[in-house]
Design a protein with these regions (language model features):
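C-terminal nucleotide
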Residues: 1-128, 140-178
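N-terminal pre-core extensions flanking Radical SAM catalytic domains
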Residues: 135-138
């Protein structure tokens, strides 16, 4: 996807979340308790737009999903990790709405890549928009026995070289040795 002319889209994500926080007397959403937010929806709906509320729902849920993903990895539970990644992706699409630009709704390459990923990987892998969204890349966790077919499909639909396979190291990029 093309990242040109997306500054307003990226700014709207932050701006709308901050508008919800300000409507609750705070500066940022991390200063707001979810239950207080949820109980204030009727009042908030009069102060901010609907998309801002949806993005706030994404924010609160995403923090929980990150905790779940970290815990899953710490406990070597890759199935739960994949579930958290996929749930995060659905939330990005439905609530954060950062998979395509509302300025160009007919260009939805990321949406199509996510759809294809779901059809190919459902129940076996995980997929989500990567980075800030609107254009660019998705992230997919593909089982080794499905990798060739997945890569072939993505490259066939989006062009040769569209699918880049990354190997995840079992340890971080830096390691402290005592």
């Amino acid at each position: 996807g093309n990242h040109s002319d997306l500054t307003d889209d990226y700014a709207a994500v932050r701006g709308e979340m901050e508008a919800v926080a300000k409507a609750m007397g705070k500066n940022v959403l991390r200063e707001v308790e979810y239950e207080e937010f949820f109980q204030s929806l009727d009042v908030l709906k009069e102060k901010v737009n609907d998309r801002a509320l949806l993005r706030a729902f994404h924010f609160f849920g995403e923090n929980e999903r990150v905790d779940k993903a970290v815990s899953s990895l710490e406990n070597n539970d890759f199935d739960s990790f994949k579930q958290a990644i996929t749930e995060s992706g659905y939330s990005s699409f439905l609530y954060n709405q950062n998979v395509y630009s509302p300025k160009n709704p007919t260009e939805q390459k990321l949406s199509l890549a996510l759809c294809i990923s779901e059809k190919l990987l459902n129940g076996k892998g995980a997929w989500r928009v990567h980075g800030g969204g609107f254009a660019g890349t998705i992230q997919a966790f593909v089982p080794n026995d499905m990798l060739d077919a997945y890569k072939e499909t993505i490259n066939r639909v989006f062009g040769d070289g569209s699918c880049h396979v990354l190997i995840i190291r079992p340890v971080g990029g830096a390691r402290v040795i005592d």
